[in-house]
Curated annotation (Swiss-Prot):
Record's keyword terms, sorted: DNA-binding, Methyltransferase, Mitochondrion, RNA-binding, rRNA processing, S-adenosyl-L-methionine, Transcription, Transcription regulation, Transferase, Transit peptide
Transit peptide: 1-27
Residues reported to bind S-adenosyl-L-methionine: 36, 38, 63, 85-86, 111-112, 141
Signal peptide coordinates: none
Species the sequence originates in: Xenopus laevis (African clawed frog)
Lineage: Eukaryota, Metazoa, Chordata, Craniata, Vertebrata
Pfam families the record matches: RrnaAD
InterPro entries (UniProt xref): KsgA/Erm, rRNA_Ade_diMease-like_C, rRNA_Ade_methylase_Trfase_N, rRNA_adenine_dimethylase, SAM-dependent_MTases_sf
Recorded name of the encoding gene: tfb1m.L
Protein name: Dimethyladenosine transferase 1, mitochondrial
Catalytic activity: adenosine(N)/adenosine(N+1) in rRNA + 4 S-adenosyl-L-methionine = N(6)-dimethyladenosine(N)/N(6)-dimethyladenosine(N+1) in rRNA + 4 S-adenosyl-L-homocysteine + 4 H(+)
GO molecular function: DNA binding; mitochondrial transcription factor activity; RNA binding; rRNA (adenine-N6,N6-)-dimethyltransferase activity; S-adenosyl-L-methionine binding
Main EC class the enzyme belongs to: transferase
Length: 344
């Protein structure tokens, strides 16, 4: 029978506080790296709890900085914690955490945008996509400057089942600038509904967990921060290639305040624009006077399916780029003022 001590929750031995580590290594948040430290362990514990049960889990933490969330992850009883940190100033403090945890922390000095996460963890953790999510998690207080390109990269990897999703439906618990968090989770008719809403919600169950006031960070950002949890679906809500979905959604939200037919129209070259726009909306059974924020996921699914059929019939259609057409018109002095604005 297990002793009470064996059941005790894992706790790090006494260490300098996060604030003391910041002073010890003379750490300052770098504005150009969009760094904001979260030093309140009650808040970092709350973030980690939203990731779910991390007992014996394998976790990748993005941008650990001075190690606030890192400590909370270790205290959750993980088997292994991989931290990917770009800033060399934080490496000594992270090594200190590794020693205190008995070697549970593996530190990689590198950029998460280029790090090969498909090689991050043991192969025995891989689960079938149809199974429950693997015991692998991504957690991070993301710098504002990389949060959007990073989540788009990961969403594409969800679609392709590559990168961290080689292991299965890996869950993500991440912080974003509050406005980005609201876009990720915005529903139909919400003013924050955007390209990011569709791209995340067609692939994942997305939850806006809670908001952290900006004053909790050092230095204090001008905005609050939202904690978002994403779990990939077994079956995406739109079953088309990621690049195709992204193109359709991007074009439609190019004119977010206008009727949706404006955005649909720029999927097609000028000489056949009117005809194919009418055809696509008719076949998808979408009201051309709906605005992008009013379109449901079902609308986008139908639009993507019809566009795929049109591209199959005309292989050159998918490679058409509206912005390239505008650039050529501008060079020839034939563009309108409105078209010039779109190139800004």
């Amino acid at each position: 029978m297990a002793t009470p001590g064996a059941l005790a929750k894992f706790r790090l031995p006494p260490l300098p506080t996060i604030g003391e580590i910041v002073k010890l290594f003379n750490l300052r948040a770098e504005k150009q790296l969009s760094q904001n430290f979260l030093l309140d362990l009650k808040l970092t514990d709350k973030i980690v709890r939203r990731a779910g049960n991390l007992q014996n889990a394998y976790v990748c933490e993005v941008g650990p900085g001075p190690g606030g969330i890192t400590r909370s992850i270790l205290n959750a009883g993980v088997e292994e914690l991989l931290v990917v940190e770009k800033d060399t100033r934080f490496i000594p403090g992270l090594k200190m955490l590794n020693e205190a945890s008995g070697g549970k922390v593996r530190t990689v000095h590198g950029d998460i945008l280029t790090y090969r996460m498909d090689r991050a963890f043991p192969k025995h953790l891989i689960k079938s996509w149809d199974d429950e999510p693997p015991n692998v998690h991504i957690i991070g207080n993301l710098p504002f400057s990389v949060s959007t390109p990073l989540i788009i990269k990961w969403l594409e990897q969800v679609a392709d089942r590559t990168g961290p999703f080689t292991y299965g439906r890996t869950q993500m618990t991440l912080t974003f600038q509050q406005e980005v968090a609201e876009r990720l989770t915005a529903s139909t008719k919400n003013k924050q509904r955007s390209r990011l809403s569709i791209m995340s919600q067609y692939l994942c169950n997305v939850k806006n967990c809670f908001t952290i006031p900006g004053r909790a960070f050092i230095p204090k950002p001008k905005v609050d921060v939202g904690v978002v949890h994403l779990t990939p679906f077994v079956q995406p809500k739109i079953e088309q290639p990621f690049k195709l979905v992204e193109k359709v959604v991007r074009c439609i939200f190019q004119f977010r305040r206008k009727y949706c037919h404006h955005g649909v129209s720029i999927l097609f070259p000028e000489e056949i624009r009117i005809q194919l726009t009418e055809q696509m909306l008719r076949l998808a059974d979408v009201d051309p006077t709906l605005r992008p924020t009013e379109l449901t996921m079902t609308h986008f699914k139908k639009l993507c399916n019809v566009y795929r059929e049109m591209c199959d019939q005309n292989p050159h259609l998918f490679s058409y780029n509206y912005r390239e057409e505008l650039r050529m018109k501008k060079l020839q002095g034939k563009s309108t003022e409105e078209e010039d604005d779109l190139l800004q």
